[in-house]
From Swiss-Prot:
Regulator of sister chromatid cohesion in mitosis stabilizing cohesin complex association with chromatin. Antagonizes the action of WAPL proteins (WAPL1 and WAPL2) which stimulates cohesin dissociation from chromatin, particularly during somatic division in root cells and meiocytes during anaphase I. Required for centromeric sister chromatid cohesion during male meiosis (microsporogenesis). Cohesion ensures that chromosome partitioning is accurate in dividing cells and may play an important role in DNA repair. Belongs to the sororin family. Residues 192-214 are annotated as: C-terminal Sororin domain. Residues 167-179 have a biased composition (Basic residues). Coiled coil: none annotated. Pfam families: Sororin_C (PF25220). Keywords: Cell cycle, Cell division, Mitosis, Nucleus. This is Sororin-like protein. Residues 47-60 have a biased composition (Basic and acidic residues). Its main location: nucleus. Residues 1-189 are annotated as: Disordered. The gene is SORORIN.
Length: 222
């Protein structure tokens, strides 16, 4: 088909009967389906599929019998084409899917593993009771030792006191004889005695000497 000619520098419009640039109805439907397909919707669908597969898994993961069966089982997921109605419903912000509550058995952990702290706690309590009993026994033994030390020290003191006491003699002790010391004659004391005797004799002679008394007569007085 010829290109539209320009008259006076203007591009002529194509006639309405020209359908060269139009697209068929089937192609419009496919393009609309592609147009309404949203990557967020595909991701949400994938999450839903994964959650369903997780729920279908057996509880006991550790068992070796069920593991090959799960591996051999094909996962079939039928994804229908997204229509306009579905795309309109899903165009609104999809609510976040609730996470499945995994039980302890799904995690591969048995209830016995959670009962271990209780047994450890009881062991600790027993150990604390044993420590208390040991402390009480040690305190009683220390008190008994102190009492024994006190009694032994008092016994030692009494023994020492009894040993320090003088033992009574059965035989009477001999009396010591007094010895009279002979006085030695000192030359100084003998000279003093002689001098004293001489002085006594001298004064005795003086006392015995009498002077004669003369009587005066009347004639002499005239």
């Amino acid at each position: 088909m010829e290109a539209p000619r320009s008259v006076g520098g203007r591009i002529q419009r194509k006639p309405l009967a020209d359908c060269t640039n139009t697209v068929s109805r089937s192609s419009q439907q496919s393009s609309s389906s592609v147009k309404f397909a949203n990557p967020s919707l595909t991701s949400s669908l994938k999450r839903l599929v994964e959650q369903t597969t997780l729920k279908e898994k057996p509880k006991d993961v550790n068992t070796s019998a069920t593991a090959p069966e799960i591996a051999s089982r094909p996962i079939t997921t039928d994804v229908r084409p997204v229509t306009r109605r579905m795309s309109a419903d899903l165009a609104s912000p999809a609510s976040a899917p609730s996470r499945p509550q995994t039980s302890r058995s799904d995690m591969g952990v048995s209830d016995k593993d959670f009962t271990e702290p209780w047994s450890v706690y009881t062991v600790r309590r027993k150990a604390s009771g044993q420590k208390r009993s040991k402390d009480a026994s040690s305190s009683t033994s220390a008190a008994a030792r102190i009492r024994l030390d006190l009694s032994s020290s008092s016994g030692k003191k009494t023994r020492q006191a009894s040993e320090n006491k003088k033992k009574t003699l059965k035989v009477a002790p001999k009396k010591r004889q007094r010895t009279v010391k002979q006085e030695k004659e000192d030359p100084v004391s003998a000279a003093c005695q002689d001098y004293i005797e001489k002085q006594k004799a001298y004064f005795a002679e003086i006392d015995a000497f009498e002077l004669p008394v003369e009587e005066v007569s009347n004639s002499d007085s005239d």
